[in-house]
């Protein structure tokens, strides 16, 4: 994912999680 949400998205992306 793009990491636009704190709980979903790439953990390397800004504000991203590790879901």
From Swiss-Prot:
GO cellular component terms, semicolon-separated: extracellular region
Keyword terms, alphabetized: Adaptive immunity, Blood coagulation, Coiled coil, Disulfide bond, Hemostasis, Immunity, Innate immunity, Secreted
Keyword Mitochondrion included in the entry's annotation: no
Superkingdom assignment: Eukaryota
GO terms under biological process: adaptive immune response; blood coagulation; innate immune response
Post-translational modification comment from the UniProt entry: Conversion of fibrinogen to fibrin is triggered by thrombin, which cleaves fibrinopeptides A and B from alpha and beta chains, and thus exposes the N-terminal polymerization sites responsible for the formation of the soft clot. The soft clot is converted into the hard clot by factor XIIIA which catalyzes the epsilon-(gamma-glutamyl)lysine cross-linking between gamma chains (stronger) and between alpha chains (weaker) of different monomers.
Disulfide-bonded cysteines: none
Compartment(s) of residence: Secreted
Assembly with partners or alone: Heterohexamer; disulfide linked. Contains 2 sets of 3 non-identical chains (alpha, beta and gamma). The 2 heterotrimers are in head to head conformation with the N-termini in a small central domain.
Known function: Cleaved by the protease thrombin to yield monomers which, together with fibrinogen beta (FGB) and fibrinogen gamma (FGG), polymerize to form an insoluble fibrin matrix. Fibrin has a major function in hemostasis as one of the primary components of blood clots. In addition, functions during the early stages of wound repair to stabilize the lesion and guide cell migration during re-epithelialization. Was originally thought to be essential for platelet aggregation, based on in vitro studies using anticoagulated blood.
Domain notes: A long coiled coil structure formed by 3 polypeptide chains connects the central nodule to the C-terminal domains (distal nodules). The long C-terminal ends of the alpha chains fold back, contributing a fourth strand to the coiled coil structure.
Protein name: Fibrinogen alpha chain
Species name: Bison bonasus
């Amino acid at each position: 994912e793009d990491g636009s949400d704190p709980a979903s998205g790439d953990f390397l992306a800004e504000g991203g999680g590790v879901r």
